[in-house]
């Protein structure tokens, strides 16, 4: 059995395609709006939050390291997430109760590399870019 092929087969083809599209994960996610419901960012690319604590996350096997991360409570919805602090020594620029800007980290909302459960990274601290602080182009404002 193949596809219906005939002058009056369009409705059957269209209905079948409509039903089968629900097997596609991207289509289903888009139509049900789960990106807005389930992701902590609520579908947006960046979010601001307040640093709750600094933590070290152990890398997965076969690597052996402690990745420097922070626990952040998002301002928009109060959800707590773990965010990676990139660059060597940049954790020193981040203090508790600082306001940070977070963005995605990794692929399609999943964790990146050997850092388990960490889906976000710190981009700005107290309104200043983390890379600018790292390269000593700017200083963190005094509170």
From Swiss-Prot:
<dbReference type="GO" id="GO:0005634">
    <property type="term" value="C:nucleus"/>
</dbReference>
<comment type="similarity">
    <text>Belongs to the universal ribosomal protein uS12 family.</text>
</comment>
<keyword id="KW-0539">Nucleus</keyword>
<comment type="function">
    <text>Component of the ribosome, a large ribonucleoprotein complex responsible for the synthesis of proteins in the cell. The small ribosomal subunit (SSU) binds messenger RNAs (mRNAs) and translates the encoded message by selecting cognate aminoacyl-transfer RNA (tRNA) molecules. The large subunit (LSU) contains the ribosomal catalytic site termed the peptidyl transferase center (PTC), which catalyzes the formation of peptide bonds, thereby polymerizing the amino acids delivered by tRNAs into a polypeptide chain.</text>
</comment>
<dbReference type="InterPro" id="IPR006032">
    <property type="entry name" value="Ribosomal_uS12"/>
</dbReference>
<keyword id="KW-0963">Cytoplasm</keyword>
<dbReference type="InterPro" id="IPR005680">
    <property type="entry name" value="Ribosomal_uS12_euk/arc"/>
</dbReference>
<comment type="subunit">
    <text>Component of the small ribosomal subunit (SSU). Mature yeast ribosomes consist of a small (40S) and a large (60S) subunit. The 40S small subunit contains 1 molecule of ribosomal RNA (18S rRNA) and at least 33 different proteins. The large 60S subunit contains 3 rRNA molecules (25S, 5.8S and 5S rRNA) and at least 46 different proteins.</text>
</comment>
<dbReference type="GO" id="GO:0022627">
    <property type="term" value="C:cytosolic small ribosomal subunit"/>
</dbReference>
<dbReference type="GO" id="GO:0005730">
    <property type="term" value="C:nucleolus"/>
</dbReference>
<dbReference type="GO" id="GO:0003735">
    <property type="term" value="F:structural constituent of ribosome"/>
</dbReference>
<dbReference type="InterPro" id="IPR012340">
    <property type="entry name" value="NA-bd_OB-fold"/>
</dbReference>
<keyword id="KW-0689">Ribosomal protein</keyword>
<dbReference type="GO" id="GO:0006412">
    <property type="term" value="P:translation"/>
</dbReference>
<dbReference type="GO" id="GO:0005840">
    <property type="term" value="C:ribosome"/>
</dbReference>
<dbReference type="Pfam" id="PF00164">
    <property type="entry name" value="Ribosom_S12_S23"/>
</dbReference>
<dbReference type="GO" id="GO:0002181">
    <property type="term" value="P:cytoplasmic translation"/>
</dbReference>
<keyword id="KW-0687">Ribonucleoprotein</keyword>
<feature type="modified residue" description="3,4-dihydroxyproline">
    <location>
        <position position="62"/>
    </location>
</feature>
<protein>
    <recommendedName>
        <fullName>Small ribosomal subunit protein uS12A</fullName>
    </recommendedName>
</protein>
<keyword id="KW-0379">Hydroxylation</keyword>
